[in-house]
Amino acid sequence: MARFIFITGGVVSSLGKGLASAALGALLQARGYSVRLRKLDPYLNVDPGTMSPFEHGEVFVTDDGAETDLDLGHYERFTGVPARKTDSISSGRIYTNVLEKERRGDYLGKTIQVIPHVTNEIKDFISIGEDEVDFMLCEIGGTVGDIEGLPFFEAIRQFSQDKPRGQCIFMHLTLLPYIKASGELKTKPTQHSVKELRSIGLAPDILVCRSEGPIPVKEREKLALFCNVRADSVIAAQDLKSIYEAPLAYHREGLDQAVLDAFGIAPAPRPTLDTWEDVADRIYNPEGEVKVAIVGKYTQLEDAYKSIAEALTHGGMANRVKVRIEWVDAELFDKEDATPYLQGFHAILVPGGFGERGTEGKIKAAQYAREHKVPYLGICLGMQMAVIEAARNVAGIEEAGSEEFDHEAGKKRFEPVVYHLKEWVQGNHKVSRSADDDKGGTMRLGAYDAALTEGSKVAEVYGSNAIEERHRHRYEVDIKYREQLEACGLKFTGMSPDGRLPEIVEWTDHPWFIGVQFHPELKSKPFDPHPLFKDFVRAAKDTSRLV
């Protein structure tokens, strides 16, 4: 049966609970334990699938089709354990489940209340698969004191009481602000945060304190005294140049040992950290640098493309180069020449997105990459924009566009080279959708197989003619234009197993120009870079030697 580690946060949000959880998971794995990480979000959305990228950042998609918080991406990248639908829950989903049960009569006419019905639903979620792993790490979103988080804090309090003594511990992440005028780290915000936590029945076993530098012994002892934790369980989380140094940094601070001590596990297996030492070496000792432009519409918030940025970093590690990402707003050249904005880059990446805004700029980015022989990777919408560019400027379909944009305009303006996908095959059954369906959870989501053309660039990159990748889209390139586009040199080199849905396109007369309908960034890891990103950065490295 699993031991449970509950990770909470205080003082301010966005301190890095997800990264701390992921790094701890990696350290426990390095000692030979199996782990699973979960995220419990107090917001009332059922999932983040319909939330604005500016509001929430990236939506991370799992193999089984869940739309989840970007922290699950950190969990996967650090541990290599594929996340599942049962690893992410929100207040919205919890309340939906409770109300559905009430409507079915499952509660036998009782009055439905936060305690016990909502808290029981949360506890049931936490318990899923507890016999499968050695450690279950559960991160509670938000900060202590948030009203919407109270049912979750009460649920984990009850959960820890339901389990045998010593089976649950609590790790609290806080901020130690540094006051330059006095040259001091201030512990009072952390003390008050722990006081708030204790007032709702939770006592932290471990304090992880974010700070700009080391925590002096005096401050550690003060925190230990007033927060009622052991001094060696006060862990410094200093600012790092790379998130992938976090496992090594936390190990140096003794986080993994503090966790094992809290559970009374002794003697504990020694960790094997060779993988993370190699990752750190590749990050901090590159042999060159490449410049990659990400041409998108959410570039003001880099978290909107979190997995893409990390996958490029992984590709850089594999090629021993630093990838310098520059964020380019596609709207800047919607109506003008893209050359001044894109010249000098060693590669161009156009990511996914929704809506018409910025799409003309993305089409011009694809055109620039094609005409100037710059390596190009188009992901999801980025592939669709590359196809539309080819249709307009090479195949002679001047009005080529997407049905998505006609839908927004309310009238037909384009020839729909990209159309609204209403039917597809998932496993052994057909999935049907209509324009009247809810927006949430109705896209083509999760892992799907694709068959690659033998001898194609992508087959060479993957080293296989069969792949499985994660998807998140409701629009698709129309197969009826395949012959016309292939006659111009844009080959459809990846298809769904039934041959109906284009998955990959590539220009045969270009050094490296690939568009994919799926999201390869979601499966990339620092110790196992995705083949597409690995080869994309290699192509950028080759280009950098020519300019």
From Swiss-Prot:
Family to which this protein belongs: Belongs to the CTP synthase family.
Superkingdom in the source lineage: Bacteria
Pathway: Pyrimidine metabolism; CTP biosynthesis via de novo pathway; CTP from UDP: step 2/2
Catalytic activity: UTP + L-glutamine + ATP + H2O = CTP + L-glutamate + ADP + phosphate + 2 H(+); L-glutamine + H2O = L-glutamate + NH4(+); UTP + NH4(+) + ATP = CTP + ADP + phosphate + 2 H(+)
Any one Gene Ontology cellular component term annotated for this protein: cytosol
Protein name per its UniProtKB record: CTP synthase
Organism (species): Ruegeria sp. (strain TM1040) (Silicibacter sp.)
Residues annotated to bind Mg(2+): 71, 139
Biological role stated in the UniProt entry: Catalyzes the ATP-dependent amination of UTP to CTP with either L-glutamine or ammonia as the source of nitrogen. Regulates intracellular CTP levels through interactions with the four ribonucleotide triphosphates.
